[in-house]
Amino acid sequence: MRETKEQPIWYGKVFSSNWVEARGGVANVVDPSNGDILGITGVANGEDVDAAVNAAKRAQKEWAAIPFSERAAIVRKAAEKLKEREYEFADWNVRECGAIRPKGLWEAGIAYEQMHQAAGLASLPNGTLFPSAVPGRMNLCQRVPVGVVGVIAPWNFPLFLAMRSVAPALALGNAVILKPDLQTAVTGGALIAEIFSDAGMPDGVLHVLPGGADVGESMVANSGINMISFTGSTQVGRLIGEKCGRMLKKVALELGGNNVHIVLPDADLEGAVSCAAWGTFLHQGQVCMAAGRHLVHRDVAQQYAEKLALRAKNLVVGDPNSDQVHLGPLINEKQVVRVHALVESAQRAGAQVLAGGTYQDRYYQATVIMDVKPEMEVFKSEIFGPVAPITVFDSIEEAIELANCSEYGLAASIHTRALATGLDIAKRLNTGMVHINDQPINCEPHVPFGGMGASGSGGRFGGPASIEEFTQSQWISMVEKPANYPF
């Protein structure tokens, strides 16, 4: 961390070409594991958004006009700056986000990979020639930058889920205004500003404005922002989509999930349970792709539940500043109350808690619940906590029906030794991503990522899909001589 003798460069500030005083005041940066104050971040307001938009609009035209190789070089250099500081990024992820250290290092690594992949997008072919029914006419469709992109990023994977929009948007010639969540304003904001600034990003091209919902609302409402890329809850995503629709503003929404982990009777049970534990309890279940519904065939359900409960009981929950824990804290007290209410509601409705179901402060034990029915809230809700609800099915048709009864459609996993059967089931799921003999928390930066239904607006991040998201199509036609029209 670059510091003066007293404090880091970002202390109490926001990044808008340079580090400047925030018009919205300041907020504490808090460690969710113990409540310690780690620092102070600036808090933006609507005036900061307006100033950033004006600067971004001016800078974007020049940024888009420079050779693609120069834009790509800056993004790659920023990636190398991240690599140099990966342990610092990981440390902040632990202290700010409640992550265990391996999660922090993984996130720094995949963000680094994402940045290099995004830099490569700038050099991909940028246009398609189409034939014409008009003699002598040439039709060219090319991709051009959207303009100014507003990125509203979440707290759970603050670095990666910001970077998957920021890096490709910049590489493709856009200016970016990033609003990180206040709960992770350093990992998902200040440090990102530092690495791009150190890499030589021109003034005005990138702005980082930590803030609350009011800042997001100002970004959505500002006509100078041409696109909003939002990752977060479906509830908030619906509001953003509605407002962007009224303004005819491009929007990319990556929203919630209530993902299924389907286990057929022929599955490798140990493998299915191993995948289930990772896919449910990673980062305390605070992952949009986490396995939120375990659909298990009756023939193996009891064995599966017992094996998963045993794994859950062996997971150590505690302060992530120690390397000896598997699960850290939930992000805030509100989330603890919400998770526990879902567990208690399931118990009252007849479900059986085989492991966990208890908490102390923000630390929630890995929990396994048996006999969960589709009408229970724990089945219908995105839990965002370390809870594995198990629902029994008797046939493949029933499993597919149970999987598809949710409004969400983000990710799924299927366990079977018959790959053809797994593929057939995958094709019938209303789900954007399906992983056979794995778990649903999967992401590779070069592969299109996104969901169906209430899990998003239908767009995708990753590889060539990012070009579709962060550019727009322009048709140019040419003829050597003007046509002689009848009037």
Curated annotation (Swiss-Prot):
Q: Which CDD domains match?
A: ALDH_BenzADH
Instruction: Tell me its EC number(s), please.
Output: 1.2.1.28
Under Gene3D superfamilies, the record lists: Aldehyde Dehydrogenase, Chain A, domain 1, Aldehyde Dehydrogenase, Chain A, domain 2
Q: Which GO terms describe its molecular function?
A: benzaldehyde dehydrogenase (NAD+) activity
Which Pfam family, any one of them, does this sequence belong to? Aldedh
Q: How does activity depend on pH?
A: Optimum pH is 9.0.
Catalytic residues, per the record, are: 254, 288
> In its UniProt record, which GO terms are filed under biological process?
catabolic process
Which InterPro entries does the entry link to?
Ald_DH/histidinol_DH, Ald_DH_C, Ald_DH_CS_CYS, Ald_DH_CS_GLU, Ald_DH_N, Aldehyde_DH_dom
Sorted alphabetically, which keywords does the UniProt record give? Aromatic hydrocarbons catabolism, NAD, Oxidoreductase, Plasmid
Q: What class of enzyme is it?
A: oxidoreductase
> Any idea which positions bind NAD(+)?
232-237
Catalytic activity as recorded in UniProt? benzaldehyde + NAD(+) + H2O = benzoate + NADH + 2 H(+)
Subunit-structure text: Homotetramer.
Say which family it is in: Belongs to the aldehyde dehydrogenase family.
Descriptive protein name = Benzaldehyde dehydrogenase [NAD(+)]
Q: Origin organism of this chain?
A: Pseudomonas putida
Tell me the classification of the organism that encodes this protein: Bacteria, Pseudomonadati, Pseudomonadota, Gammaproteobacteria, Pseudomonadales
Q: Which gene encodes it?
A: xylC
